[in-house]
């Protein structure tokens, strides 16, 4: 939890409590339904929560913004972002029902009011959103093809509507077809831990 406060020191008391509660909740649920590698659960705050919050180093969502988290798994990046941006509406979607159940139970336990959930494949989701966020679910080209239909034409943030992905490693080849509308941000510029040396936030305007 200290690592979250290190980089986000201005959290409200409620946000601090919500972030602090995540550890025991994920330990408990992960023992029943595996949503995080058992070897990695001890690194929950660095590898999952802070990594999710890396998106906030690229954009500050305005109140009323609608965001879909595609392939949310156990709730990443959607749940940490929903805590950080309580006036933004998050819709968490995953094709695996038991993972959606974990994310739903965790969100309910910490009292999140700005999240909805859906057990469905991405192709089935028809709602419009300002942004789609995702964490290394599939190659960028496949992701853009699927979510183009979900991006609202109305812009209400400083950044044009589009896709924001958390990815790692070498991305030049993957982003090449979209290079004129894509920005790659290295999280090593924001977070000093070794884990973030190869981690990126990829924004594609759609």
Swiss-Prot record:
InterPro entries: rRNA_ssu_MeTfrase_G, SAM-dependent_MTases_sf. GO terms for molecular function: rRNA (guanine-N7-)-methyltransferase activity. The keyword Cytoplasm applies. It holds the Pfam family GidB. S-adenosyl-L-methionine binds at residues 71, 76, 122-123, 135. One of its GO terms (cellular component) is cytosol. Keywords: Cytoplasm, Methyltransferase, rRNA processing, S-adenosyl-L-methionine, Transferase. Signal peptide: none annotated. Its EC number is 2.1.1.-. Belongs to the methyltransferase superfamily. RNA methyltransferase RsmG family. This is Ribosomal RNA small subunit methyltransferase G.
């Amino acid at each position: 939890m200290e690592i979250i406060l290190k980089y986000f020191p201005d959290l409200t008391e409620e946000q601090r409590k919500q972030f602090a509660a995540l550890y025991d909740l994920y330990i408990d649920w992960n023992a029943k339904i595996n949503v995080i590698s058992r070897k990695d659960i001890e690194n929950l705050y660095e590898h999952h929560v802070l990594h999710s919050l890396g998106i906030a180093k690229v954009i500050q969502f305005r109140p009323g913004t609608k965001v879909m988290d595609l392939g949310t798994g156990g709730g990443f990046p959607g749940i940490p972002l929903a805590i950080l941006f309580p006036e933004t509406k998050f819709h968490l979607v995953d094709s695996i029902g038991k993972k959606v159940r974990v994310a739903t139970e965790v969100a309910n336990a910490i009292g999140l009011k700005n999240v909805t959930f859906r057990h469905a494949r991405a192709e089935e989701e028809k709602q419009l959103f300002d942004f789609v966020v995702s964490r290394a679910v599939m190659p960028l080209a496949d992701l853009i093809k699927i979510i183009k239909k979900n991006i609202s034409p109305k812009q209400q943030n400083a950044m044009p509507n589009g896709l924001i992905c958390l990815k790692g490693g070498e991305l030049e080849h993957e982003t090449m077809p979209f290079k004129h509308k894509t920005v790659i941000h290295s999280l090593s510029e924001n977070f000093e831990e070794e884990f973030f040396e190869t981690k990126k936030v990829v924004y594609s305007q759609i």
